C-alpha cells in the first residue's frame, strides 16, 4: 500500500516537472525554434485549429521561422493569429510561405522573461509540494487506521520527501538552464 502511494506520488510529481518544462519551452529566447508557435490557434472554418495543422514550420536560420501554408487561402488568418499572439512577432507573407523574423530581445524583455520563468518554476514547485502533501495525508490515514506502524509512517514520509527534493532539483536545473539561455543569446 505504501509503495503504491509512493509510486503514485512520484508519477504525479514527474508530470508536474514535465508540465513546467513544457511551459518554459514555449518562452522565446531569441533563437528561432518551431515549437515557439505551438500555442497559436488559428480560426479555420469556424474552429480554433493549432497552427501546426495548417502549416509546416521550420527554422530558416537562427532568427527566422518559415511557415509553408498548406491552404493558401489561410495565409491571412495565420498571419493575423501570429500578430495577435503575445509573442511580439511580425510575420511577412510571400505567397504560400510566411516568414517570421524574430526581433532581438532587449535587456528589459530578457528580465521580464526571466521573471516569468521564475514564476513558472515556483508554480511547479508548489505543484510538487501539493502532491507530497496528498501522499503524506494518505500515509497518515493508514497510520490512523492502524494499517501501518509509526516507524513505517516516518520512513515513508522520508522517502516521499527525498522524491520531492529530487523533483524540485530537476525544476531548479531546468530553471537555471533557461535563465542561462535567455541571458546568453
From Swiss-Prot:
Record's subcellular location: Cytoplasm
Major localisation: cytoplasm
Entries under Pfam families matching the protein: RRF
Keywords, sorted A to Z: Cytoplasm, Protein biosynthesis
Recorded coiled-coil stretches: none
Functional description taken from the UniProt entry: Responsible for the release of ribosomes from messenger RNA at the termination of protein biosynthesis. May increase the efficiency of translation by recycling ribosomes from one round of translation to another.
Protein name as annotated: Ribosome-recycling factor
Annotated source species: Edwardsiella ictaluri (strain 93-146)
Organism lineage: Bacteria, Pseudomonadati, Pseudomonadota, Gammaproteobacteria, Enterobacterales
Amino acid at each position: 500500500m505504501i509503495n503504491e502511494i509512493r509510486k503514485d506520488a512520484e508519477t504525479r510529481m514527474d508530470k508536474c516537472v514535465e508540465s513546467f518544462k513544457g511551459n518554459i519551452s514555449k518562452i522565446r529566447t531569441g533563437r528561432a525554434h518551431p515549437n515557439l508557435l505551438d500555442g497559436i490557434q488559428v480560426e479555420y472554418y469556424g474552429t480554433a485549429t493549432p497552427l501546426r495543422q495548417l502549416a509546416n514550420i521550420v527554422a530558416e536560420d537562427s532568427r527566422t521561422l518559415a511557415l509553408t501554408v498548406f491552404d493558401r487561402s489561410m495565409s491571412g488568418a495565420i498571419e493575423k493569429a501570429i500578430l495577435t499572439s503575445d509573442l511580439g512577432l511580425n510575420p511577412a507573407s510571400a505567397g504560400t510561405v510566411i516568414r517570421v523574423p524574430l526581433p532581438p530581445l532587449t535587456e528589459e524583455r530578457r528580465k521580464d522573461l526571466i521573471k516569468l520563468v521564475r514564476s513558472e518554476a515556483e508554480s511547479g514547485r508548489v505543484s510538487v509540494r501539493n502532491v507530497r502533501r496528498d501522499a503524506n495525508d494518505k500515509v497518515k490515514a493508514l497510520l490512523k487506521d492502524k494499517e501501518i506502524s509509526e516507524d513505517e509512517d516516518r520512513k515513508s514520509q522520508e522517502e516521499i520527501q527525498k522524491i520531492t527534493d529530487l523533483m524540485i532539483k530537476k525544476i531548479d536545473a531546468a530553471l537555471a538552464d533557461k535563465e542561462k539561455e535567455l541571458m546568453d543569446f
